């Protein structure tokens, strides 16, 4: 039996989770065929794997080989992302044949690499304690118009409860700049309550798209993508059904000076909402993560915030983050919450050794490493406040959460401020300045490569010495 490319054109998502014990290849140039399949038990989407082949003809040969050597029936083979090369997702009728199918694919001269469609999850400690919003995910609410902000600015009433801002020197940095809507930051997460009273003014509005006309006006492959995209449910309303993504977005850039609620580290920004995680567990697939990263890369994001992890090493994800690096985009990643050493037990995407990846551990209000936080003197770069962090949640609400998920957005917000003041800074410069300017802490010595916690006030002092006066401000 042979499947043609035409007969394999549709997509079929499978949500069931399992474990396969397939570990992706190690980093660097090693061939995946040299890496043994282990029993580490990473979760994956049942019956699915991703494969990169040399040509469409190679895909046909691979499918034929799957029937003969793995005894598996390939049902659907869609292109994963036409702009990222010949990546395909293969669905097998029998999940028990997945291990054999990947092994046989890796032995084929037509295959560059093959890996399971891993599952990822949020890196917050306690989303379960926050009530789930009643309406989210597929079919989220219509976009509302942003209200006019008060002039002059009015103090945010809950800002006194945000110890993280004072720890990192945010108020001092605001004397230079509070951010700018010109800085586009992609929050890749569970979606965002894009109508939240403290977020609506800082949501990205795709200038090349007309809302609700059913036309892909900007020809980017996504119809009516006004504030971003929902890759989990495949629609234009990336509304948060978990609370996690709204919380991380609020830490990055809740509107400052509107007299409501809280403030982000950056009081102004443009937040691109990219949802690939969802549900009460805040989970999503490798396939959708790659699509979200590529969307951000191709649609103008300058910084990406990533408070999620899980799964084994993925060459597909490594390549996607590399494409972002090629465009100078900073990729901020949460270190993970297992309390383990990322140098010896890598967490992904935090442990990808790429120039644009900046990995963040969590500290508490006493500047101690959080008990749950992953660390690593090589793999983790710096720390930021991540315990009992107050921020936005769906439905115009607020809550305190803990996790490296909460630490990473502090660094993202700091990067927004630097990018506002020094627009020519790319990922390499942003990463270097944020690392070189940390507040040295004894509790972090030997735990993160810099030995310190984020200090945006010092980052501006270093930037001034390196690049001169800022180019923009309040």
Language model regions located:
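Bacterial N-terminal signal peptides
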Residues: 11-20
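Extracellular S/T/G-rich loop segment that most often corresponds to the catalytic His/Ser-adjacent loop
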Residues: 329, 347-420, 424, 428-432, ...
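Structural recognition of the beta-strand scaffold that forms the well-ordered cores
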Residues: 50-52, 89, 113-115, 184-187, ...
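Bacterial N-terminal signal peptides that target proteins for export
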Residues: 1-12
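C-terminal subdomain of the subtilisin-like protease fold in secreted/lumenal serine endopeptidases
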Residues: 263, 292, 297-308, 315-316, ...
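Subtilisin-like serine protease catalytic core
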Residues: 171-285, 302, 325, 354-356, ...
């Amino acid at each position: 039996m042979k499947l043609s490319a035409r007969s394999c054109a549709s997509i079929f998502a499978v949500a069931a989770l399992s474990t396969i014990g397939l570990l992706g290849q190690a980093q660097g140039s090693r061939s995946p065929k040299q890496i043994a399949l282990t029993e580490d038990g990473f979760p994956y989407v049942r019956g699915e794997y991703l494969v990169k082949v040399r040509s469409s003809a190679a895909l046909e040969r691979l499918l034929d080989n799957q029937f003969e050597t793995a005894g598996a029936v390939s049902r659907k083979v869609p292109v994963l992302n036409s702009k990222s090369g010949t990546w395909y997702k293969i669905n097998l009728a029998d999940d028990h044949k997945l291990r054999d199918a990947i092994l046989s694919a890796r032995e084929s001269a037509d295959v560059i690499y093959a890996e399971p469609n891993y599952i990822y999850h949020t890196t917050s400690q306690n989303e379960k304690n926050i009530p789930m919003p009643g309406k989210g995910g597929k079919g989220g609410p219509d976009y509302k118009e942003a209200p006019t902000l008060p002039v002059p600015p009015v103090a945010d009433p809950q800002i006194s409860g945000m110890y993280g801002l004072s720890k990192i020197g945010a108020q001092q940095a605001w004397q230079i700049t509070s951010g700018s809507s010109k800085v586009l930051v992609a929050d890749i997460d569970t979606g965002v309550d894009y109508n939240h009273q403290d977020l609506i003014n800082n949501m990205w509005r795709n200038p090349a798209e007309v809302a609700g006309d059913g036309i892909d006006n900007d020809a980017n492959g996504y119809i009516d993508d006004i504030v971003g995209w929902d890759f989990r449910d495949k629609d234009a309303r990336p509304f948060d059904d978990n609370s996690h993504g709204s919380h991380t977005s609020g830490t990055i850039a809740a509107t400052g000076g509107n007299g409501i609620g809280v403030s982000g580290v950056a009081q102004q920004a443009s937040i691109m909402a990219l949802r690939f995680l969802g549900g009460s567990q805040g989970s999503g697939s490798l396939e959708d993560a790659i699509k979200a990263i590529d969307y951000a890369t191709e649609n103008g994001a300058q910084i990406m915030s990533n408070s999620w992890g899980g799964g084994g090493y993925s060459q597909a994800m490594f390549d996607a983050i590399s494409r972002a690096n090629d465009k100078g985009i900073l990729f901020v990643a949460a270190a993970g919450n297992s309390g383990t050493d990322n140098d010896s037990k890598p967490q992904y995407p935090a442990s990808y050794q790429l120039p644009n990846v900046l990995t963040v551990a969590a500290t508490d209000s006493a500047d101690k490493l959080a008990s749950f936080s992953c660390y690593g003197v090589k793999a983790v770069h710096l720390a930021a406040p991540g315990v009992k962090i107050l921020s936005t949640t769906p439905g115009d609400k607020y809550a305190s959460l803990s996790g490296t998920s909460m630490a990473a957005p502090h660094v993202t917000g700091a990067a927004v401020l630097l990018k506002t003041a020094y627009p020519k800074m790319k990922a390499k410069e942003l990463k270097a300045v944020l690392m070189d300017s940390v507040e040295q802490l004894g509790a972090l010595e030997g735990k993160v490569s810099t030995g310190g916690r984020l200090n945006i006030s010092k980052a501006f002092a270093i930037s001034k010495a390196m690049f001169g006066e800022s180019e923009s401000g309040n």
